[in-house]
Regions:
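Solenoidal tandem-repeat scaffolds enriched in leucines and small polar residues
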Residues: 125-154, 164-166, 172-203, 224-233, ...
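Short glycine/acidic-enriched loop and turn motifs that connect beta-strands
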Residues: 102, 150, 200, 249-251, ...
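Blade-edge motifs of beta-propeller repeat domains
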Residues: 2-33, 59-77, 107-125, 155-175, ...
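Hydrophobic beta-strand segments that make up the repeating blades of beta-propeller
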Residues: 48-54, 95-99, 143-147, 192-197, ...
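Surface-exposed loop and edge beta-strand positions of immunoglobulin-like domains
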Residues: 41, 85, 98, 133, ...
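Beta-strand-rich domains and repeat architectures in extracellular enzymes and scaffolds
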Residues: 24-53
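Gly/Ser/Thr/Pro-enriched helix-cap/hinge segments flanking short amphipathic alpha-helices
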Residues: 1, 266, 325-338, 344-484
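Beta-propeller blade termini
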Residues: 35-45, 80-89, 128-137, 177-187, ...
Length: 484
């Protein structure tokens, strides 16, 4: 698909990332080794984004960030992972923390504090990389954890309790020590996994419904030492979610194109990006549209010896990625990435965590030369209740002139680059339950809260077989925007 954007050289010439850590008042690190845990979200509902980094909860106040860990009721420790997610569907973000060999689930009390509900819910939560998602499409967020002994899947029972369904789901042997990401890779309106693990290739697990997943036979990544990190995004704007694989041990990054939802093929065109990680260990990777041109770029962080490494590659929209890492400041060894519009100025800033439990803000100055649209979804708590509050797992399709792009909703905040378009022609939300909802002609450079509209059940198609009417299919309007 084509795109109409301001000349890239003009945008990039005026764009820089500035280390604004001291300016916004982020305190120094905890000093604990290897606590580069990072989560970024508005947990207190006051409209600005807060941080959980290195085991500390930092509340965003007018004068800077304040350490409220003890006041908020969070335990101290040596965390290895953390993630915000609204497991009880009340519109306030709860928190999972992996520390000291176990996982703890904290419920947001809506007053700035959290309560540890792990025991009261009867949870036996492993420590590992967490993922909140609604894999069974019943309207609440389940919890997946990639732990030291393999993958775990805990189903939310709609009443606040969880059931371990790992064995039935078939992901227990997915591998240990890596990470998980989700998306609807085959475009059949359910949530699939991609699992990265130590000692094996990354692998896609297709959702077969009824709580079961099946591993695709082909692996992603060519290294037996393991893939470590994977990231999901439609980087070629064809409507299907692709996968970036970042192996451990200073080996090349790999990109896999989703070929119409059926198979993944290695994309060897972006040579600069593919060779980029050979000289450092990648600890995290993310897709990010840093210049608002509607094409997903790639961000990598890690270390080489005692030196930090951060690399940024701009998607040139023609199968190539240009190395624009000179737009970034020097950094210490880094562990994790979180992106979002911290400055609320229309472009995506970058938070990174360091090995000693500190966070740094790399402020995007100039990415808003192109236009944008920010969205937040709100699922209905009435009616069928089949969509979680923030719409995690929904698919967004956006068309603006010749620019078409797809985004999978993985958190409350959705950022869409529009290039130089003054508006989008249409934004289609396909909610996690498969029901579509269209927003026509939203103007650029604004934030939109899109609430789910209660609709009747979808129409069904029956055919007469000579003796009786037989069911053919439901009509869920699954074609991409602008396509038959």
């Amino acid at each position: 698909f084509g795109t109409e954007v301001r000349d890239a050289e003009t945008v990039l010439a005026a764009l820089r990332f500035t280390d604004a850590t001291d300016i916004v008042g982020i305190p120094a690190g905890s000093g604990a080794a290897n606590t580069g845990v990072l989560a970024f979200a508005d947990y207190d509902g006051d409209g600005d984004r807060d941080l959980f980094v290195g085991g500390r909860l930092l509340q965003n106040e007018i004068t800077g960030f304040v350490d409220v860990t003890q006041v908020a009721g969070l335990a101290s420790g040596q965390p290895s992972a953390a993630l915000f997610g609204d497991y009880d569907n009340d519109g306030f973000l709860d928190l999972y923390v992996a520390a000291d060999g176990e996982g703890r689930l904290y419920r947001n009390a809506r007053d700035g504090s959290f309560s540890d509900v792990t025991s009261s819910l009867g949870l036996s939560v492993p420590a590992g990389a967490p993922l909140f998602l609604d894999f069974d499409q019943d309207g609440d967020l389940d919890l997946s954890v990639s732990g030291a002994s393999g993958g775990f899947l805990l189903r939310n029972n709609l009443d606040g309790s969880f059931t371990d369904v790992t064995s039935r789901a078939g992901i227990g042997n997915a591998g240990a020590g890596g990470s998980m990401a989700f998306g609807d890779f085959d475009d059949d309106d359910d949530i699939d996994f991609v699992v990265s693990a130590d000692g094996r290739q990354a692998r896609v697990y297709d959702n077969e419904r009824l709580g079961r997943f099946a591993a695709r036979p082909e692996g992603l990544g060519s290294y037996a030492a393991g893939t470590g990190i994977s990231s999901v995004g439609d980087y070629n704007n064809d409507g299907f979610l692709d996968v970036l694989v970042a192996p451990r041990g200073g080996r090349a990054v790999e990109l896999y194109l989703n070929e119409s939802g059926t198979t993944f093929g290695a994309d060897d065109r972006p040579t600069a990006l593919l060779a980029s990680a050979r000289d450092f260990d990648v600890h995290d990777a993310a897709f990010i549209d840093f210049d608002n041109d509607g094409w997903l770029d790639v961000l990598l962080v890690g270390e080489s010896g005692d030196e930090g490494v951060i690399r940024l590659f701009r998607n040139a929209a023609a199968g190539q990625f240009d190395d624009v890492s000179d737009l970034l400041p020097d950094v210490p060894p880094l562990r994790r990435i979180a992106t979002g519009d911290f400055g609320d100025d229309g472009d995506l800033d970058i938070f990174v965590s360091t090995a000693d439990g500190a966070a740094r803000l790399l402020r995007n100055d100039g990415g808003n030369a192109n236009r944008y649209l920010k969205m937040q979804l709100v699922g209905l708590s009435t009616g069928s209740g089949k969509n979680n509050h923030f719409g995690l797992g929904a698919k967004l399709e956006v068309r603006a002139g010749g620019l078409y792009q797809t985004r999978v909703v993985t958190g409350p905040d959705i950022h869409i680059g529009l290039g130089q378009h003054a508006r989008a022609d249409v934004v289609r939300v396909r909610w996690p339950n498969g029901v579509p909802q269209n927003l026509f002609y939203p103007g650029a450079n604004q934030s939109v809260v899109e609430e789910q509209i209660l609709k009747g059940s979808c129409p069904f198609l029956y055919t007469w077989d000579g003796e009786a009417f037989t069911f053919v299919t439901d009509l869920m309007w699954k074609s991409a925007l602008g396509m038959p």
